[in-house]
Amino acid sequence: DIPPEMNSTFSMLRLPPFPEIPEPFRGGFWARVCLAWTGDTEAGEKLLAPLREAAPVVIDTVEEMDYAAVDRIYLDPQDPLPARESCTLLRELTPRAVDAFLDQAGPAAGAGDYPLLMVEIRHMGGALARPADVEDAVCARDAEYLLEAVGVLAAPPMAEAVEHATR
């Protein structure tokens, strides 16, 4: 169970060998965990400790920050990219769904010509699941997770592959 003060994502990244991407990430396959925590610092550190121990950590950017700086959590590119994104909401994350995620986005999926830059599962729930005090346009508050796939539309054959993969 994740407290409502935490937002978390798990991503599979296949980064292109572009010079703009810093080493050691350039041209590699990476698993990424991103977190935002709005609670007590000590409680957040306790929740984070098992993640830090679960696997080798290449970069740890967890820090206290102002709300205006939260865009740094994902380390996304600051310049626009020609990309296509597809998202779907999941009410639950079953073992079967995790297996499908790993089959389709994990290290063994389509090595070399894999069209997607990132496939991510984002935990929703928490405060987002609570009904608003006033009427709003937020739907599907019962969705616990968001599944997102992103591909860069680099050249026509890759653009077609990304188009197909994000359907």
Predicted regions and their residues:
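Soluble FAD-dependent oxygen oxidases
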Residues: D1-R167
